[in-house]
Every structure is written in structure tokens, then in C-alpha cells.
């Protein structure tokens, strides 16, 4: 097999993809043909499988998230399946980095300022607050909460934009005040 870089092909991704695509005659880009369509879905599945390996190697960190596509990236339609698969996997599988240096599904994480995370960081704090259904009582941590998501090192960075595109729930000081003033705490 021979490798030809598709110099005019723009994926909008911040990582390289290699597959046996049918190229244009000039070999400068990938041809719009039905033969290439299955490769994009296979690359999406491979990318998600790779995230599990990256996590297991200890490399799926907050900083790594800056490499992944975020909602503000200009990604051509045929590459959207890769972005969608990554977001779905991060939301549903234990792949999202947490404040406590572990991984959890993004749907089961909360985001807050670092000072609030540090205040309520022990497993006992999370268990104490983890007693109510979040949808019925949004100011409380929920029964299905695994703790705090990792925070972005800089606002409006690729890392921050990626985290904002996940199903992580925001939790703030007002939520905390409502929690400690609630009848449950009496």
C-alpha cells in the first residue's frame, strides 16, 4: 500500500486520519463517492475506541481535550460523524476527565468554579449532597452524579469549548446556597 497525503483535504480536526480513501485523480483530496462513506463511520468508531486506550495509558487529561473537535470548529459534513461519536462517547462512557483525576460519563458530572470544587471535593461531601434527583431539584447534586468535571485551564480555549459541548451540568455558588438553605439540610 502507498500513502498519499491529501494536501487539499480539510477535515477541521486537530489530528490526522489515515484510511484507504478513494482519492481525486490529483490525489490532493478525497473523492465524493459512496465508496468513501463507510470509512468515515469506521473512523468514528476507531476514534472512540482509541479514546479508551488513550485513557488507559493515562493520557486522556484535561489538556488532551483541546485536541478533540468542539462545537465551534468548522468541520465539513462528512467528518461530522467523528465529532458526534466523540461527544456521544464522552457523554455516555467513563471517558471525561474529572477534577479528582479519574474519568466518568459527562452526563454524570457537574462543572463549577475551582473554589467550589475544592470546598466540596471529598467523596463524603459528594455522597452527602448526592441524595436527590437533579431534574426535580437542580440546585442539588443528583443521585446519578459522579462528581466534578475537570476545569478548563483557560476560558474560551479549545479545551473549554470542548467541555462546553458535553452534557456536563453547571453548578454554582447560588446552587450551593440553595442547597444549604433547603429543608433537606435541616
Regions found by a protein language model. Name each.
Residues 1-186:
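GHKL/Bergerat-fold ATPase module
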Amino acid at each position: 500500500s502507498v500513502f498519499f497525503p491529501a494536501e487539499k483535504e480539510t477535515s477541521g480536526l486537530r489530528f490526522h486520519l489515515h484510511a484507504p480513501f478513494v482519492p481525486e485523480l490529483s490525489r490532493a483530496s478525497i473523492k465524493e463517492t459512496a465508496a468513501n462513506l463507510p470509512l468515515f463511520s469506521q473512523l468514528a468508531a476507531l476514534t472512540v475506541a482509541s479514546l479508551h486506550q488513550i485513557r488507559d495509558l493515562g493520557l486522556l487529561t484535561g489538556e488532551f481535550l483541546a485536541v478533540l473537535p468542539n462545537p465551534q470548529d468548522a468541520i465539513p459534513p462528512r467528518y461530522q460523524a467523528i465529532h458526534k461519536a466523540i461527544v456521544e462517547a464522552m457523554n455516555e462512557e467513563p471517558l471525561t476527565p474529572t477534577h479528582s483525576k479519574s474519568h466518568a460519563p459527562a452526563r454524570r458530572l457537574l462543572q463549577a468554579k475551582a473554589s467550589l470544587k475544592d470546598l466540596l471535593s471529598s467523596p463524603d461531601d459528594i455522597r452527602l449532597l448526592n441524595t436527590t434527583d437533579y431534574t426535580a431539584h437542580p440546585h442539588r447534586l443528583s443521585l446519578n452524579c459522579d462528581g466534578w468535571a475537570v476545569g478548563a485551564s483557560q476560558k474560551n480555549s479549545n479545551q473549554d469549548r470542548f467541555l462546553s459541548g458535553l452534557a456536563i451540568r453547571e453548578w454554582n455558588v447560588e446552587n450551593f446556597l440553595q442547597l444549604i438553605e433547603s429543608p433537606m439540610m435541616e
